[in-house]
Amino acid sequence: VIESIEAFAVQALCVADELGFPEDKVNPNGGAIARGHPVGATGAILTTKCLHELQRINGKYGLVTMCIGGGQGIAAIYEARQDL
């Protein structure tokens, strides 16, 4: 599952295409353009969406990308544990 920030939609689409992300794995339940979220809530919202989708599909890894202002960005990779 890949939850990618869409603050700049064209950039997000180009990066996903360049990195070869499968379309069905990127923002599977709609991204920021489709659903929206308040400024400052990106990390919490995208991480929660990613973790819920991993649970729903019994997935193993999730990638979350976020913009953090000033032209900077951050990413986090999560691994769902099946042994809990």
Walk through the language-model features, giving the residues of each.
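Claisen-condensing/thiolase-fold acyl-transfer catalytic domains that form or cleave C-C bonds
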Residues: 1-84
